[in-house]
């Protein structure tokens, strides 16, 4: 959430930033609403001040045996007391209206973020590795998985409907191996602390990360009002909600390997076959909590940690800097990692790493105490996928496919595969 004080002082900057994101100007309406709210606050404060002063004057009048004045003052105090509830209610309503409006405004992009409309305007930052060179024809992951006999969409649909998958045997083990490899890498070598956290959260947690109120249609909601997490970013980031941290203890780096749940409400007709876009999928999430000065460097570090997963798997990928029109709601700058999928003859997103500034921290009231002046400031938050397990499975299947239809296990996963070096067709 943006600071209304900053908006009051920089209305043109807000509208310019919104224009970069393809959004309409909002500063004038926000400033006008804030003026009404501040006026209501001042009115309530004036009434309280006058009531308190009149109450003291009653005592003075009585001590001077001026009963007539005391009675007049008592009448005034009663009138002021009667007026206060309406003024305070106006203040509450205007504050709620302003906060709701602020909660729906996206974050301000950094100056170095490329301006653009959509994914076609994203910029290639770097490319790692090369496309595999084969004599055989590439295949899509669902063709490979079904031919092996370990990937079943028909049974998944019978169980749960569309956008679900059943994996069995060595493919189920490969999925588990990928997740275990990622969490081991990030905790043992990248300095992240593993967290096991709930898969259901309250609305307040989703508000904190910016998923609510704007993106409720993307979420699964339980009958008791809780939500299934769309990503472990929600739980990991909210670990510091309503806390004041010591600057000396920053950065905090958290990671979790969890299922994620998404309704894919805006994805009708997209990636309907296979595992690319599922309602339920495993993901290894990375979250960093930093001070303001360290956030940009931490963003580069986090992205490098996610890239390391793909490098060790021997996968060809590129890192994209997202343009203003393609960035997430809470992001100030985002790198997407796109892995090469031979079966699609295309790069597809496998990780997204974002720096959010104090945007989420304001929503969570998460702060740190400065080590020099001891003043309290909002933390800066970052999040990234390290990486999406299902999409990594897809990439391994398509990039390690052999001519006979078998799939070679990448070397880095061999310790997790119980002696299996290749996945072959089920007998």
Curated annotation (Swiss-Prot):
Pathway it belongs to? Aminoacyl-tRNA biosynthesis; selenocysteinyl-tRNA(Sec) biosynthesis; L-seryl-tRNA(Sec) from L-serine and tRNA(Sec): step 1/1
PROSITE patterns assigned to the protein according to its UniProt record, in alphabetical order: AA_TRNA_LIGASE_II
Mind telling me which Gene3D superfamilies this protein's record contains?
Answer: Bira Bifunctional Protein, Domain 2, Serine-tRNA synthetase, tRNA binding domain
Q: Give the reactions, separated by semicolons, that this protein catalyses.
A: tRNA(Ser) + L-serine + ATP = L-seryl-tRNA(Ser) + AMP + diphosphate + H(+); tRNA(Sec) + L-serine + ATP = L-seryl-tRNA(Sec) + AMP + diphosphate + H(+)
Which residues does ATP bind? 262-264, 349-352
Annotated GO CC locations? cytoplasm
Q: What residues bind L-serine, as annotated?
A: 231-233, 285, 385
Q: Does the keyword Metal-binding apply?
A: no
Q: Which domain of life is it from?
A: Bacteria
- Record flagged with keyword Lipid biosynthesis: no
Q: What's in the keyword line of the UniProt record?
A: Aminoacyl-tRNA synthetase, ATP-binding, Cytoplasm, Ligase, Nucleotide-binding, Protein biosynthesis
Where in or outside the cell?
Cytoplasm
Q: Which cysteines are joined by disulfide bonds?
A: none
**Domain characteristics, as noted in the entry:** Consists of two distinct domains, a catalytic core and a N-terminal extension that is involved in tRNA binding.
Q: Extract the NCBIfam families matched here.
A: serS (TIGR00414)
User: What is the recorded name of this protein?
Assistant: Serine--tRNA ligase
What gene name is listed for this protein? serS
